[in-house]
Amino acid sequence: MRVLRAILIALLLFPQVLRAQFSFDPGEGCLNVVEFTAGPGLGALGDRLIGANYLHERFINEQFSFGAGAGYSYHQQYQFSALPVYFSTHYFFVDSRFSPFVNLKAGIYWMLGPKNIDTFLKYSISGNQPGLSLFVSPGAGVKVHLTSHIGLMASVSYDGYLANAFDSAKNNYHTTMVPNLGINFGLCFQIPGW
C-alpha cells in the first residue's frame, strides 16, 4: 500500500516538475534583487566597502531587464556612508537555469557623515565635496535558479564613487573616482503580476 501511495504521489508531482521553468518569465512580473556587497579598494585611492542594494527591473524580453535601484554603502577608510540611487540593467546571455550576465548601475549618490575631511592625509575628503555626486557600477556574474520565481546571483563589480579626494602623490585634492572591487551575493525573485 505504501509503495502504491508513493507511486501515486510521484505521478501527481511529475507534471509539475516538467512544467517548472528555470528562468524568469517576462510576462509574470519584474525582476527584484536584494544584494549584499563587500570588497577591497582598487588602486591608490581605493577603499574597502560594505553595502546592500535593492533593484527593481522590468523585463524588456527574456534576456534584458531595465529598472531602478537604491542602496547603502560604508567606506571604511574614507569614513563616510553613501546612499546611491541609480538606473539598473541586466543582460542574461542564456535563458536557462544557470545564466551568466552583465549588469550596469549608474546614477547619483549622497555622501553622509564624512569624518575624514580636509586633513590633507590619504583617505581624506575635501570640505568642498558636493552633496550629490556620480555613482557607476559595471559588473558580471552568474544567476542560478532555485525555482521558477527564486534564484541566487553572484557577481563581481567595479564600484566607482566620484569624490573630491586627497591624492597623496599629487599632495592636493582633486575630483576622481574612488574605485572599489565589489563582491556581490544576492537573492533574485519574481512576484507574479508585480
Q: Language model features by range: what are they?
A:
Residues 19-66, 186-194:
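Short glycine/proline- and aromatic-enriched beta-strand/turn motifs that initiate or cap beta-hairpins
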Residues 55-137, 144-150, 184-194:
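Gram-negative (and chloroplast) outer-membrane scaffold detector with strong preference
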